[in-house]
Each structure stands twice: as C-alpha cells, then as structure tokens.
Amino acid sequence: QPITDSQRLFSIAVSRIQHLHLLAQRLFSDFESSLQTEEQRQLNKIFLQDFCNSDYIISPIDKHETQRSSVLKLLSISYRLVQSWEFPSRSLSGGSALRNQISPKLSELKTGIHLLIRANQDGAEMFADSSALQLAPYGNYYQSLGADESLRRSYELLACFKKDMHKVETYLTVAKCRLSPEANCTL
C-alpha cells in the first residue's frame, strides 16, 4: 500500500518534533547541571507552583482524553503550542549552537502542521479561531532582572519548552497513528 502525502507529512512532523523535544531536554539538563544542588531544589519547588504560558491553550488533560481527541483537534493544539514558542524560543538559555537550531525548526514544524490541518479539514473551518488566541510572549520575562530572578526565569522557560515539546510530540504521534490503518494507538 503506497504512502500518502499525509502519512509522509506526518512522518516528517513527528521526526521534527522528536528532534525539538530532544533539543529541549538537552538544553534543560545542561542548564540544570550548571546549577548548585540547593539552587536546583529551590527552582524545582518554585516551578511546581508556577504555570507555563501555554497552559492557557486548552488541551487534553490526560492520555485518555488525548486518545479520544480528533486528529484535527490534536493538530490544532499542536499548532498553537508550536506557535506560542516562536518568539520566546529566541530567549532560551543554553549553548548558542543548540539555541540557533530551535527557531527555524519551530517555524518548519508550524508550516508542516498547518499543511496537515488543511489536508485533514475536509471543509471544516475549525482552524480559523486558532489565531485569535495570541499569548503574551511570557509576560514580564524580558524585563531586566536580578541574578536570582533571571536564573528562575531561565529555568521556567526551559522547563515549559521541554513540557510543551513533549505534549506536541505526543499529540502528533497519536494523530499520525490514527491515520495508519494497521496501527494500535495506545499511549
């Protein structure tokens, strides 16, 4: 059975998000390993109480809800999550070689997801509202901060980026699986 354009696009998108998720994990663990143990404990405590900017994007709350979500819904949420990182990704801490890869990869992924949404819409105009939700680019993140506050912000941004890339990877993998006739799509 020949591979359809949609399956090929999904394979590329899943491969790209897996790479971005690995980059996010690497940036986060590099940042964590640069911290003192006490600093790390404090940041972990603070982060557990904080929210990511993207938490305002309505998404499935668990794997069961993810499994029940339509392909189009998973694609739309993925698009919004990727879009929400286009600007903040330029401020991620970490090695510049890694950081410089992120913005273009996010942009390519966003384009790919947009094509997948169009291919899976079947005339439904569900995508129009996604541009209505423009998240603030991490609020007051860009103010000049003291050293401790700057450290906390870098930690939050990297942790949120890692979390969101994991979400997108999960959603795209489930959506891709749904379009594959012989697949078992359990998480």
Curated annotation (Swiss-Prot):
Which cysteine pairs are covalently linked by disulfides here?
C52-C160, C177-C185
Q: Which GO terms describe its biological process?
A: animal organ development; growth hormone receptor signaling pathway; positive regulation of growth; positive regulation of receptor signaling pathway via JAK-STAT; response to nutrient levels
Modified positions (Pyrrolidone carboxylic acid) in chain numbering: Q1
Q: Where in the cell is it found?
A: Secreted
The family database entries (Gene3D superfamilies) matched by this protein are listed as: 1.20.1250.10
Single annotated GO MF: growth hormone receptor binding
Keywords, ordered alphabetically: Disulfide bond, Hormone, Metal-binding, Pyrrolidone carboxylic acid, Secreted, Zinc
Q: Which residues bind Zn(2+)?
A: H19, E169
* Xref: CDD domains: somatotropin_like
Secreted among the record's keywords? yes
Q: Which GO terms describe its cellular component?
A: extracellular space
**Role, per record:** Growth hormone plays an important role in growth control and is involved in the regulation of several anabolic processes. Implicated as an osmoregulatory substance important for seawater adaptation.
To which protein family does this belong? Belongs to the somatotropin/prolactin family.
Put simply, this protein is called Somatotropin
